[in-house]
């Protein structure tokens, strides 16, 4: 009898450990804390790029605040965002690349949807810190959403709209004491494949976020 009990206990322990090790396909983010932070002028004074990151993971609440600040919905009645976009195309997708996998940020439902179970952080940049920092954001411009625009305009406005989002992230990180740097050196071929991007989706920039070392 004792042997049976022991075997059952061992089985349950293994089952629980396997479940806990599974990557979540959907992560519902908590509501953003919109009442926190430093005054704007102080944040502008503190804004800077950093390349020294601690590997400590960001809490889910911090990630929620960060993504909402980046390009979340701040006017529920219209679905408009914290960052402007040309013609209100809202063509920029944010992919959140972490040790646990790569996720697509869904601003409408303020949640993350799993895209890849692999740790793709190293592909987000050539610098060594990209694979140590807990979060790398990859900004993708979906040209299919930019109806009526020429190829040149799609390139220009896609880059501009990503720039607005990246600056929002810079300001949030300055307010919260996080280290951050935006980068153009990205392994676009590897990420395009791993993130299952369509030909119309173009990687513009990546941005690394974490605690300062």
Segments from the language model and where they lie:
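Positively charged n-region of N-terminal signal peptides that target proteins for export
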Residues: 1-4
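A glycine-rich helix N-cap at a beta->alpha junction
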Residues: 196-213
């Amino acid at each position: 009898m004792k042997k049976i009990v022991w075997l059952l206990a061992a089985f349950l322990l293994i089952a629980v450990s396997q479940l806990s090790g599974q990557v979540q396909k959907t992560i519902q983010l908590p509501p953003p804390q919109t009442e926190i932070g430093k005054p704007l002028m102080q944040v502008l004074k503190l804004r800077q790029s950093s390349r020294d990151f601690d590997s400590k993971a960001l809490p889910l609440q911090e990630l929620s605040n960060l993504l909402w600040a980046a390009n979340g919905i701040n006017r529920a009645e219209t679905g408009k965002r914290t960052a402007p976009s040309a013609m209100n195309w809202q063509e920029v997708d944010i992919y959140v690349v972490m040790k646990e996998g790569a996720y697509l940020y869904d601003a409408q439902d303020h949640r993350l949807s799993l895209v890849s179970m692999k740790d793709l952080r190293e592909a987000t940049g050539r610098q060594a810190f990209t694979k140590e920092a807990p979060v790398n954001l990859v900004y993708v411009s979906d040209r299919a959403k930019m109806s009526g625009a020429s190829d040149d305009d799609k390139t220009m406005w896609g880059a501009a709209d990503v720039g607005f989002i990246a600056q929002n992230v810079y300001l949030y990180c300055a307010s919260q004491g996080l280290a951050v740097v935006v980068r153009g050196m990205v392994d676009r071929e590897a990420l395009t494949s791993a993130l299952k991007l369509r030909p119309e989706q173009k990687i513009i920039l990546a941005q690394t976020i974490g605690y300062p070392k």
